[in-house]
Amino acid sequence: MRTFALVCAAGSGKRFGGSTPKQFLFLEDKMVIEYSLCVFENSPFIDGVVILIPNGYKNIGDVLKEKYKKVLFWDYGEDERAKTVKKGLELIKGMCDFVAIHDAVRPFIDLELIEKLILEVKSSFAVAPAVSAKDTVKYVVDGYVQNTIPRENVYLVQTPQVFKFDLIYGAYEKFEDTCFTDDLQYVEALGVKPKIVENSSLNFKITTKEDMIFAKAIVEQFLK
């Protein structure tokens, strides 16, 4: 049973700003994307890695493939994340039994998380890390609170999201014209109920410059 990691690194980072996509910015001695690549490289539960990058970054793709032995190949992504994932799934079809789809701008995954997810997906077929909501959650329309959502049932979902390959591939095939906000939604649309694995809030997505400040602090405090 083979498991591949599909690393989505094709985003341009418009909200972040700057000329270099945030996944290729340096945190100390490594690019943001490399932190998760290091984990996949060292996990005995991951057999291969495929990276999808933006157009114009061939040099970085080549560097990463040379540096990390589990990186089988890289290719260019699309202009939307869902299309990038679909392309990645097409590229690895028939090569693996399970796939872990990961956002390159979530650098702080670890080996223990990967192990938990891979062991769980063998029986659940769709699983993702998540952190329970700690703040009170309001449903708001046009700036006005409509109601309060019980936070004990609210989780903030992260990546990598791990699937039985045939399940997620079939879901993307069926709903290829629908752009859901994460991969779990595709299998949810089939009636599947994914499993959640509780995780640390350190596995956040770097979206803004403030997030990068937090990421640098984490590296300096815990990873140097």
Swiss-Prot record:
What are the entry keywords?
A: Isoprene biosynthesis, Nucleotidyltransferase, Transferase
Pathway, per Swiss-Prot/TrEMBL? Isoprenoid biosynthesis; isopentenyl diphosphate biosynthesis via DXP pathway; isopentenyl diphosphate from 1-deoxy-D-xylulose 5-phosphate: step 2/6
Q: EC number(s) in its UniProt entry?
A: 2.7.7.60
Q: Which residues cross the membrane?
A: none
Domain of life assignment: Bacteria
Catalytic activity, as annotated: 2-C-methyl-D-erythritol 4-phosphate + CTP + H(+) = 4-CDP-2-C-methyl-D-erythritol + diphosphate
CDD domains tied to this protein: CDP-ME_synthetase
Keyword check for Nucleotide-binding: no
Q: Which GO terms describe its molecular function?
A: 2-C-methyl-D-erythritol 4-phosphate cytidylyltransferase activity
Name the residues annotated as site: Positions MEP for the nucleophilic attack: R151, K205
Q: Which GO BP terms apply?
A: isopentenyl diphosphate biosynthetic process, methylerythritol 4-phosphate pathway
Q: Where is this site: Transition state stabilizer?
A: R15, K22
Q: Which family does it belong to?
A: Belongs to the IspD/TarI cytidylyltransferase family. IspD subfamily.
Q: What is the protein's known function?
A: Catalyzes the formation of 4-diphosphocytidyl-2-C-methyl-D-erythritol from CTP and 2-C-methyl-D-erythritol 4-phosphate (MEP).
> By what name is this protein known?
2-C-methyl-D-erythritol 4-phosphate cytidylyltransferase
**Which organism does this sequence originate in?**
Caldicellulosiruptor saccharolyticus (strain ATCC 43494 / DSM 8903 / Tp8T 6331)
Gene that specifies this protein? ispD
